[in-house]
Design a protein with these regions (language model features):
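RNA pseudouridine synthases
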Residues: 1-291
Length: 291
């Protein structure tokens, strides 16, 4: 069993354990609930607990288990792969990893079929997954094949040295050619399935510029600085330009779209093993059109 020993800085327990990028916040929360964390020698089961500053926090990492997800022969666009990582294109409508209601047909099921190995840090249901895209968002994703690579890529995400760009078709006419949205995001107090602008939320920054604009919509090139859940969708809705096809944050009477008009088209990072700068581009599929 591997031990991770930390000194509390007074923040939430799940936040503390995910700060170095080894674990996602959701994975840290799962381990806390499973009783894998002690605070000053006593088990703490609440991810939201805030140990006093200076308290000793110990995480006992469980032995990695074989992935529970099954390999499935699902078509998958693999742009690049080597012994350490892969870059794939997730189609619109595909869930990233198995969960309640989506036991199969996910990106993870496809990865287990097409790739020779995957990292185990993400847990039994999320092997190889370094970062995610919403079900209805298409585009580029990195996949780690070993734990060392997973940790290094997660560190780049945390340090914001990784560059991610999206194309989004949004409703309305933009008054400026470019802009920055720098407002905190937290889970909605009214609907736990939604995120919302909240002064007490996590810092969130989105940069955008117009690629083209028509009378009732615009295509934006969006640089995602932070990576909060639903960040682009929440931020664009907050300035009254929701992403077309968004069933959660969209508004009535906006132009119709066949799908959520959001695509992760560009990804740049440093290869953990070689130090080489890697950049990948994948243009949207044919259905990425408004009607």
């Amino acid at each position: 069993m591997e031990l991770l020993e930390l000194i509390s800085d007074g923040t939430r327990l799940d936040v503390l354990l995910s700060k170095d990028g080894t674990l996602s916040r959701s994975r840290a929360a799962d381990l806390i609930r499973e009783g894998a964390v002690t605070v000053n020698g006593k088990v703490e089961n609440k991810p939201s607990a805030k140990p006093a500053a200076g308290a000793q926090v110990v995480l006992t990492m469980p032995e990695l288990k074989p992935a529970l997800a099954e390999a499935q022969d699902i078509p998958l666009g693999i742009l690049y792969q080597d012994a350490h990582l892969a870059v794939v294109v997730k189609p619109c409508g595909m869930v990233v990893h198995p969960a309640a209601g989506n036991p199969d047909g996910t990106l993870v099921n496809a990865l287990m079929y097409h790739l020779d190995q995957l990292s185990g840090i993400g847990g039994e249901m999320r092997p190889g997954i370094v970062h995610r895209l919403d079900k209805d968002t298409s585009g580029l994703l990195m996949v780690a094949k070993d734990d060392e690579t997973h940790k290094a890529l997660s560190d780049q995400l945390s340090a914001r040295t990784m560059e991610k760009h999206y194309y989004a078709v949004v409703a309305g006419v933009m008054k400026e050619q470019e802009g920055v949205i720098d407002t905190p995001i937290a889970r909605s107090k009214n609907d736990r399935k939604k995120m919302a602008i909240d002064p007490l939320g996590r810092p969130s920054r989105t940069e955008w510029k117009i690629v083209w604009q028509e009378k009732d919509r615009a295509l934006l090139d969006i640089h995602l600085i932070t990576g909060r859940t639903h960040q682009i969708r929440v931020h664009m809705a907050s300035i009254h330009h929701p992403v077309l096809g968004d069933p959660i944050y969209g508004v009535k009477n906006m132009p119709h779209a066949k799908r959520l008009m959001l695509h992760a088209y560009s990804l740049r990072f440093t290869h953990p093993a070689t130090g080489e700068e890697m950049r990948f581009v994948a243009m949207p599929e044919e259905c990425f059109k408004a009607e």
